A protein has these predicted regions:
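Structural signature of nuclease core domains in nucleic-acid processing machines
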Residues: 1-296
Length: 296
């Protein structure tokens, strides 16, 4: 409200879905009464915060996603979860046997998540560039500043969970990843109607930030993805090798979203993707004749 509006992509999505709900939540700031309990929605928040803490601890210990050993990964996960829980809800998670079980569940989900994210990175050439990038203070970003009229301006704020990049000559290829605990699939119809703006806003901001931080380089979009944080069950058969089980897990943990339909970019994201194959790490597949599948 006012002549200079400051909103997040989520707020704009809420307004597009229901203007009255937007008014109640962001105008009147109505919210549910907080209770001393740990609900299912809190589980997603804790996992998200623990994953952010893991990224910080990884950097602090001067480790990389690619070089991280299983032992180092598990130790960092335990540390990150304990640090997150200590700061969450005045130790609410330590208040009952049920919540103690939830701590173990968070650690299990996070182990599966970090393992899958490692495999996705190892499949291609991209490297994580930045984590938890806030662009609310970037006043001069064209991607987050819009002149609505002579006197009115809209400034978007937000935080990108992760930006990956691959540099070749004078070009920086960029993909953004947003961690989700629900099953919000990217839907182009929802994008068209303004109900899913987050990934597009984040990708545009990431491209502009990369060019700003690397003068003389040109940033190109490679993809925008949701990663669903979960620990899925897979159908197995007696005698299945560990490699086959991991393949099924990766299929279930594949990112969802849009990838740029260019052979070079697809190959740089998944070097094993070729004619007649479906990627285990990105939403792309080739027909036997080498054309992109309609499922891509």
């Amino acid at each position: 409200y006012g002549k200079e509006l400051e909103n997040s992509a989520t707020e704009l999505e809420r307004f597009a879905a229901c203007a009255f709900a937007h008014f109640l939540q962001y105008g009147l700031k109505i919210e549910e009464r907080q209770e001393y309990e740990f609900r299912q929605a809190d589980l997603g928040n804790v996992i998200h915060q623990a994953l952010e803490q893991f990224s910080r601890n990884l950097k602090k210990n001067r480790l990389t996603w690619r070089s991280l050993t299983d032992q180092e990964r598990d130790q960092l996960i335990d540390t990150s979860v304990e640090e997150t829980i200590h700061d969450y809800g005045n130790t609410i998670l330590e208040s009952s046997a049920r919540n103690q079980y939830m701590i173990l569940r968070v650690k299990r989900i996070l182990r599966r998540t970090v393992w899958a994210l490692q495999q996705q990175l190892k499949a291609g050439k991209y490297e994580p560039s930045r984590f938890e990038i806030s662009f609310s203070m970037e006043e001069d970003l064209k991607a987050s500043n819009f002149q609505l009229s002579e006197d009115e301006r809209l400034r978007l704020r937000g935080r990108i969970d992760r930006v990956d990049r691959y540099e070749e000559d004078d070009t920086i290829y960029v993909k953004v990843i947003d961690y989700k605990s629900g099953n919000t699939a990217l839907d182009l119809t929802s994008v068209y109607h303004g109900l899913q703006l987050q990934l597009i806003v984040y990708l545009n901001a990431a491209l502009e930030l990369e060019e700003k931080n690397h003068p003389g380089k040109h940033a190109e979009p490679a993809g925008m993805f949701y990663y669903y944080v979960k620990d899925p069950l897979v159908d197995g058969k007696p005698g299945d090798e560990e490699e086959e089980i991991e393949r099924k897990l990766l299929e279930k943990l594949k990112v969802d979203g849009l990838v740029r339909a260019e052979e070079k970019i697809l190959k740089d994201l998944d070097r094993e993707l070729e004619a007649g194959k479906k990627s285990l790490v990105i939403p792309a597949a080739y027909n036997k004749n080498g054309s992109l599948s309609s499922r891509s």
